[in-house]
């Protein structure tokens, strides 16, 4: 193996995202790999009974995506990753990460893991699912 060529960083834009991206930066520097960042907005539509509370022309999904783009840009600026490719996708987090890994032909996925306790351990997690289903190497950065 000659090293990684394309590292995809999946971030949730919480404070731990900086640590995840920093770890990926270290690896990219070591291997001379391309870096890309991905955030998935998992939009859950408001149920019809709740729609009456919102003014009709509100584009919640669009606002969530624009806010995520701003935060992803700020993260890249803070880490000196202005030239890194970045994507904000809408959909199921696991499905979108798997789709983007395949589209981008990433050979390493880097993501963070918040510690799970009690019932959450039995329910499974996005991270656990991705480790088993992603067609490339996965580095899970422990954040807790």
Question: Each PLM stretch: what is its role?
Answer:
Residues 1-2, 30, 76-109:
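Structural beta-alpha unit
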Residues 2-54:
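Small/aliphatic-rich secondary-structure junction motif
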Residues 38, 85-89, 139:
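General small-molecule cofactor/ligand-binding pocket signal
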Residues 52-56, 103-104, 127-129:
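Short, hinge-like loop/turn segments at secondary-structure boundaries
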Residues 55-68:
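A short acidic, glycine-rich active-site loop
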Residues 108-129:
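Glycine-rich, Arg-bearing micro-motifs that act as flexible, cationic patches
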Residues 126, 134-135:
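Short, structured coil segments at secondary-structure junctions
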Residues 138-144:
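Short, flexible loop segments at boundaries between secondary-structure elements
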């Amino acid at each position: 193996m000659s090293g990684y060529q394309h590292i995809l960083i999946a971030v949730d834009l919480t404070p731990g995202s900086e640590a995840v991206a920093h770890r990926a930066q270290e690896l990219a520097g070591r291997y001379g790999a391309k870096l890309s960042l991905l955030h998935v907005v998992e939009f859950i539509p408001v149920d019809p009974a709740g729609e009456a509370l919102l003014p009709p022309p509100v584009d919640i999904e669009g606002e969530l995506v624009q806010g995520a783009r701003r935060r992803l840009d700020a993260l890249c600026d803070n880490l000196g990753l202005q030239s890194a490719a970045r994507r904000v996708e809408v959909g199921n987090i696991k499905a979108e990460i798997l789709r983007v890994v395949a589209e981008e032909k990433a050979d390493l996925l880097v993501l963070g893991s918040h510690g799970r306790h009690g019932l959450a351990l039995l329910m499974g997690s996005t991270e656990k699912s991705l480790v088993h289903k992603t067609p490339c190497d996965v580095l899970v950065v422990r954040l807790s």
